[in-house]
Amino acid sequence: MFIRPVLSSSLGHAARSSLRSQAPAVRQYATEAGKSSGGSNLPLVLALGGVAGIGAWYGLGGFDDPKKVSNKIQEKGKEAVDQAKGAVEGGALNKDQFVEFTLKEIKPYNHDSATLIFELPEGKKPGMGVASAVVVKAVGDGLKDDQGKDVIRPYTPITSPDTVGHMDFLVKKYPGGKMTTYMHSMKPGDKLGIKGPIAKFAYKANEFESIGMIAGGSGITPMYQVIQDIASNPSDKTKVTLIYSNKTEQDILLREQFDQLAKKDDRFTIIYGLDKLPKGFNGFEGYVTEDLVKKHLPQPELADKAKIFVCGPPPQVEAISGKKGPKGSQGELKGLLAKLGYQADQVYKF
């Protein structure tokens, strides 16, 4: 049993748990200078222009020892260079430094999820590729872990990379989750430190004939990014099948977008799974089984014409495809997909 909503090319830029795997004794739940001459730089500072130049001079030390002023100028210059290096061309993000963005609005989504809309500078896009991620942290000393270190977590926006003026995150609040609890407590006008992008899988149109996706809970967000990109490009002929599992029907994220456009584009098949199916719900119940994957996802025999994406809580990822390696590496392919004969280069773990 499955639902086959199809996504329209009109999705464009406006649209954008408990996954379980049948594995032995495993049940997972869907629930981050220039060289100095040593001389005085006073003429250079004053040459910056009028009052602004004098103000800059005072800001750098005024009548202090010329060497101190020179050192301060070099420090400021290095800081500006570092910022320029990290800035993504034409984008609001910086991959090397946290930039503070202001929360414009927070929209409740369901009983435990909300969409947080952050303002970008006027006319700016985020400056990231499809399915890229960012890391976030509270500003100042707002949120620390048990060791006193900043809590930093990764997130994937649900807005497309071409969205101008704002960047949206759909955040599910998990019990005991420090960052999700913090983000849900934010109010319009509050700021959040965001750094990125972190490059993930570099999707290219028509690179594969078929893509299979297995997601649980908030692991839907990178999948949605890829789906948005394909749906907005009529020339991309890639077929996509998404298996998306949650605890209850109310936990399904972005369902409105999927269902609203379900009948308009046969490139997409969406298969919902729940712990227990309510009466009349079209989907599968319980585990993601080998038979389910065999029936609906592109098979290993397609070789480099197929790709399988996996995203969700660590227990889910481990059961489906083996856990990720250190420092964000892919790690060894194990779990259900390995058992079915998929090769490591056919699978990507977000």
From Swiss-Prot:
Pfam families found in the cross-reference section: FAD_binding_6 (PF00970), NAD_binding_1 (PF00175)
Keyword vocabulary terms for this entry: FAD, Flavoprotein, Membrane, Mitochondrion, Mitochondrion outer membrane, NAD, Oxidoreductase, Transmembrane, Transmembrane helix
Keyword Oxidoreductase in annotation: yes
Binding site for FAD: 207-242
Molecular function per GO: cytochrome-b5 reductase activity, acting on NAD(P)H
InterPro entries according to UniProt: CBR-like, Cbr1-like_FAD-bd_dom, FAD-bd_FR_type, Flavoprot_Pyr_Nucl_cyt_Rdtase, FNR_nucleotide-bd, OxRdtase_FAD/NAD-bd, Riboflavin_synthase-like_b-brl
Catalytic activity: 2 Fe(III)-[cytochrome b5] + NADH = 2 Fe(II)-[cytochrome b5] + NAD(+) + H(+)
SUPFAM superfamilies per record: Ferredoxin reductase-like, C-terminal NADP-linked domain, Riboflavin synthase domain-like
Lipid bilayer topology: Single-pass membrane protein
Domain FAD-binding FR-type: 96-204
Entry's localization field: Mitochondrion outer membrane
Any Gene Ontology CC annotation: mitochondrial outer membrane
Chain segments annotated as transmembrane: 43-63
Class of this enzyme: oxidoreductase
EC code: 1.6.2.2
Cofactor(s) demanded: FAD
Entry keyword annotation includes Flavoprotein: yes
Recorded family membership: Belongs to the flavoprotein pyridine nucleotide cytochrome reductase family.
Function per UniProt: May mediate the reduction of outer membrane cytochrome b5.
Stated name of the protein: NADH-cytochrome b5 reductase 2
